[in-house]
């Protein structure tokens, strides 16, 4: 479980702070697929980077429950090396960028997920290799294990990066736009896979996406970043049905000619002639 308490996210700009969103209080639960949605530029990437400890919060804190040790706290205070090492065994991150690797096989790249345990240049023992093989199997790409990364399709490459995160054996996986650049069937397959992994492995899986209708159909929970009446960024949390019923999704989605059907959770386009 991950708890956000009075969290303020943003950037340090010379002598002042650029606040993106403040007073965020929320909880991410294990065994669920949670999708972060919202307009371009509203701060989804900033929130994801803060959760991943790639940048520090401006205020507040993030508490990550640790099955093996004491909880890890992410705050404005810099983390120690020992805390960073523990964090690498708690959080796996899958980014949108293509991996900058050449002449590396799928098995070798997924094997890098074991580096928190072996060191970056560490050799994989038999247990590590078994974990890599199981990760490939969970994602359904065991037949690709000997393929070079540069020969993969976008969908195959994305599955490889997810397998790498699984091989890291973290209880938490964050993904930034995992369905970007995929065709529609591959988008459905990817989100369905992530939901299945969350449920089967009891992991906390949290991702940002612009694939609104798929998120409505597949996510267990939605985090909707939106602007309130005072133009401050607000975070609305609930199941797709809950956010459809209370009008939050319609307020975000509906435009002239674009309408959310709250009963079917589908987006309808009219007057497109």
Predicted features, each with a name:
Residues 37-39:
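The feature captures the beta-strand-to-loop junction immediately N-terminal to the Walker
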Residues 52:
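Helix-to-loop junction immediately C-terminal to a conserved catalytic motif
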Residues 111, 126-144, 169:
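Conserved ABC ATPase "signature" region
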Residues 148-152:
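Conserved ABC ATPase signature
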Residues 173-176:
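Catalytic Walker B motif of ABC-type/P-loop ATPase nucleotide-binding domains
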Residues 209-210:
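H-loop/switch region of ABC-family ATPase nucleotide-binding domains
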Residues 241, 251-273:
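ABC ATPase nucleotide-binding domains
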């Amino acid at each position: 479980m991950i708890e956000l308490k009075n969290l303020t996210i943003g950037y340090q700009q010379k002598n002042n702070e650029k606040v993106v969103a403040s007073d965020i209080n929320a909880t991410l639960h294990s065994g669920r697929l949670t999708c972060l949605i919202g307009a371009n530029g509203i701060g989804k990437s900033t929130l994801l980077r803060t959760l991943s400890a790639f940048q520090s919060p401006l205020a507040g804190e993030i508490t990550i429950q640790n099955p093996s040790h004491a909880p890890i706290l992410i705050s404005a205070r810099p983390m120690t090396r020992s805390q960073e090492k523990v964090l690498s065994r708690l959080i796996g991150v899958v980014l949108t960028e293509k991996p900058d690797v050449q002449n590396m096989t799928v098995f070798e790249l997924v094997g890098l997920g074991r580096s928190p345990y072996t060191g970056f240049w560490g050799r994989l023992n038999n247990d590590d290799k078994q974990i890599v093989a199981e990760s490939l199997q969970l994602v359904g790409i065991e037949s690709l294990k000997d393929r070079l990364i540069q020969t993969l399709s976008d969908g195959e490459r994305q599955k490889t990066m997810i397998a790498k995160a699984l091989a890291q054996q973290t209880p938490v996986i964050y993904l930034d736009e995992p369905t970007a650049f995929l065709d529609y069937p591959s988008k459905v397959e990817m989100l369905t896979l992530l939901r299945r992994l969350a449920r089967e492995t009891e992991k906390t899986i949290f991702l940002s996406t612009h694939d609104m209708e798929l998120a409505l159909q597949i996510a267990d929970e939605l985090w909707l970043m939106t602007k309130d009446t005072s133009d401050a960024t607000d975070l609305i949390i609930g199941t797709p049905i809950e956010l459809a019923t209370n009008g939050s999704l319609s307020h975000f989605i509906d435009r002239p000619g674009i309408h959310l059907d709250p009963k079917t959770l589908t987006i309808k386009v009219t007057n497109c002639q």
